[in-house]
Amino acid sequence: MRFKAKILLAMVTVGLTAPAIAGLVLKKTPYFASIAAGKARMRTGPAKTYPASWLYQRADLPVKVLDVYDRGAWIKIEDPSGTQGWMMGTLISDTRTGLVMGTIAELRDSPRYGGKIVWRAAPGVVGRLSKCARGWCYFDVRGRGGFVEANHLWGVATEESLN
């Protein structure tokens, strides 16, 4: 009897913690994430049997998570160009990144228009995001960073706050 109780308890524990381990499952969609792998296939449906529609070769590219299938095994995403499809959940990271859109983004030493410009980033540059508040985010590109207006980036909402 004790053995069966231990097995049952273990099964319940695994069942309750599995979504927490996946991480992505617990969030309400849509939300921003990024591609974790250097090569990642987008598919037309949530299984390896569906054909690949795109091969991404850019780790940290920001994506918008639209749906989660099979407890996080498959994630429906949208890329910065608006293309939608499915990726394996293991290829998606919670790491927040942004992509410079439109014109050159000015990175400043403080989150305000009067801040000194310390770097400039061209359209298409991807960087890590942090400290987002009141329409500004700290944008780090391989150790060189500064504050940029969130509306110059794809991968963060202008009203969003990040630590």
Language-model region placement:
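Bacterial N-terminal signal peptides that target proteins for export
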Residues: 1-8
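Beta-strand-rich domains and repeat architectures in extracellular enzymes and scaffolds
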Residues: 51-52
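SH3-family beta-barrel domains
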Residues: 21-44, 55-59, 66-71, 75-111, ...
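Repetitive helical segments and hydrophobic/amphipathic motifs
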Residues: 13-15
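N-terminal signal peptide c-region/cleavage motif recognized by signal peptidases
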Residues: 17-19
